[in-house]
Amino acid sequence: MADETNRNVNEQPQAQDMGELLRIRRDKLKVLQEEGRDPFTITRFDVTHHTQDIKDNFDAMEGQAVSVAGRLMSKRGMGKVSFCDLQDKTGRIQIYARKDEMDEDNYNHFKKYDIGDIVGVKGEVFRTQRGEMSVRAHDITLLSKSLRPLPEKFHGLTDKEIRYRQRYVDLIMNPESKRNFEIRSQFVAFLRRYLDGLGFMEVETPVLSPIAGGANARPFITHHNAQDIDMYMRIATELHLKRLIVGGLERVYEVGRIFRNEGMDTKHNPEFTTCELYQAYTNLDGMMDILEGILTGAAKEILGTYHVQWLGHDIDLTPSWQRVTMADVVKNVTGADFMACIGDADKGVELAKSVGVDMDGVAHTWGNALYETFDQKVEETLIQPTFITMYPVEVSPLAKRSPTQPELTERYEMFICGCEMGNAFSELNDPIDQYERFKAQAAKRANGDEEADMMDEDFVMALEYGMPPTGGLGFGIDRCAMMLCGTDSIRDVILFPTMKPLDN
């Protein structure tokens, strides 16, 4: 039988050899089982330390007995002395195995183990003559047999697809990928601590609902067999959370999955994670303070700096961030002064077209003209953290109108590198106004706009009981993780992104 025991992890098995390599490993497993050493019958191995613990505390631990476990990533030598690299969740450490310091059978069995096998090692901490921090093995136990060889590494577009489809292999082979998900996890943990510290209460709201509301998006539809009704996967958590503000909870937030039946690109996945929060007795300014506090605090705690490299730019998260109205930033970038013709649809549309904005397929209103000019000409120029405020009412059906300029709303979106990172309102709490806006959205939906809001009469009824002045904020966990990790694709921060099934 051919032997791949000494194959270094840096050797890439050729496609034509894969069948043979799989057969070899299955044959090895069969021999183990026949000898009564089936690794899959083992249920426990007591680990005393992780590899990074040993490295961080080496001076204090030298000579100390330890038990470590992990995956074999390389093997070197096979005479009386062998070396291997063991990888656990914290990193790698060298294992030093010497025949005359181990049970002879144990050492001979170890020689037959393969790259990718999972082992438990008992030994003592020491440094080799070359100065390598290591564990001197006294006993090595095979805990799980790897029946499929590990690849060398991932590279190129084709291999990037494999990374997303086989994340389990990506995490084994690429420390930077695992680091991305550690940063994401740390960000969510920081977020919860931050909001809990402000007196917010974490809640859970329905994922399935008879009405899809709270955002302009196309929902996924499913069917509830017992009740024989169609239901929607939620496109936002907003309307349920605001019901809780009506109920008197005052400060609530939810970190949860959102589902939108829309296109996919480097910034969008149909299944993604958001945080939405609502606070009674505050407004848009309070929501700006919270989002800025979350992102600056997370960067400082997780990365140790306010400066991050993202999408080719050096992003400075140092407080305080720029705050500017949509009309002002449009004027600054394009020269188009929409406030000079506020409320005049014809002049607004003419102004938008004069700076090259495409208004086809968009209702010709002043507010839409302003928004389309911002969307098409300005958004991509917003590199450093910037709050854009005072959105047109046409694109903000759930935000409170400006008391001095009713064509505009007390809403902001925050942008970094041209990406929308957060969306917040001084929440609309007038049930009569809300009902009229729902009617306008329903009319759009009746005319074929599948992303327009549905009428939600129960939500209007909740507002009729009275909702205090409230600030609301929603932001994507995935995009925040992208920024903190410095990645250019949302798939790099979602463990199992949506992928088109392979033909076979």
Protein language model features and the residues they cover:
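Class II aminoacyl-tRNA synthetase-like tRNA-binding/catalytic domains
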Residues: 2-7, 14, 18, 29-35, ...
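TRNA-recognition modules of translation machinery and tRNA-sensing kinases, especially anticodon-binding
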Residues: 115, 121, 233-238, 245-259, ...
